[in-house]
A protein has these predicted regions:
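Pro/Thr/Ser/Gly-rich low-complexity, intrinsically disordered linker/stalk tracts
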Residues: 188-213
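Cysteine-dependent hydrolase recognition
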Residues: 1-196
Length: 213
């Protein structure tokens, strides 16, 4: 908990830089008429522009995030409680420091995060930058309001309530109880750093100065 609160504070005060781009490892593609990774493909170009979205191959997810910064990262693959095939395992969160603030994952089993050694929860406990972790695809998530300054908590509620407002080709498991956010619901993608170096003087008048955000 101490580590999470510290990196949350650092993100809000821009003590580390999160490059505005997205990373994708898509091991499913078209899966029985649905495409789980559409949650990344339709949001990341909107957030950052198509030139700031990178797709990596098998084994490239953690090795890339350990060395480069991405504001958002997505990975999907056949799952277990502690892994997503072609993406990584909980051990990768321990041995590496993934530099993605918002993490979106999809695969079997680990969406049930109330177990030990859980792949979805491991991200926010890592020494990397991850502050929010989402299990998406069943149903699809809608986080586009974050591009206009809304919080991830706002988008969590939007997704939880969504049935017909936003539609995908399939939207299996819409409005079910498992839709949840791992992390701080007040996080925003567009952080405004607090003003710094406040000073005041009082003579004939009171004069306040500060360094702007």
């Amino acid at each position: 908990l101490r580590r999470y609160l510290q990196k949350n504070h650092e993100f809000r005060h821009r003590a580390f830089t999160s490059v505005r781009r997205g990373l994708i490892r898509d091991n499913f593609g078209d899966l029985n008429g649905d495409a789980p990774a559409v949650d990344a493909w339709r949001h990341y170009p909107q957030f950052f522009g198509p030139g700031q979205v990178r797709e990596v191959g098998p084994g490239g997810f953690f090795s890339t995030l350990n060395n480069e910064s991405f504001l958002w990262a997505y990975g999907c693959g056949g799952g277990g409680n502690n892994k997503a095939d072609g993406v990584g395992t909980t051990t990768d969160f321990v041995t590496q420091s993934p530099r993605a603030v918002f993490l979106v994952l999809h695969g079997s089993y680990f969406g049930d995060w109330n177990v030990t050694d859980n792949f979805l929860r491991a991200g926010i406990a890592s020494s990397g930058h991850t502050l929010a972790s989402i299990w998406s695809g069943l149903p699809h998530w809608y986080v586009h309001p974050m591009g206009l300054g809304e919080s991830i908590g706002f988008c969590t509620r939007l997704t939880q309530n969504n049935l017909n407002q936003y539609r995908s080709h399939q939207n299996i498991s819409a409005q079910q109880v498992h839709i949840s956010l791992i992390g701080d619901p007040t996080l925003e993608m567009l952080q405004v750093v607090p003003a710094r170096n406040f000073a005041g003087s009082a003579a004939a008048n009171i004069n306040l100065t500060w360094s702007p955000s």
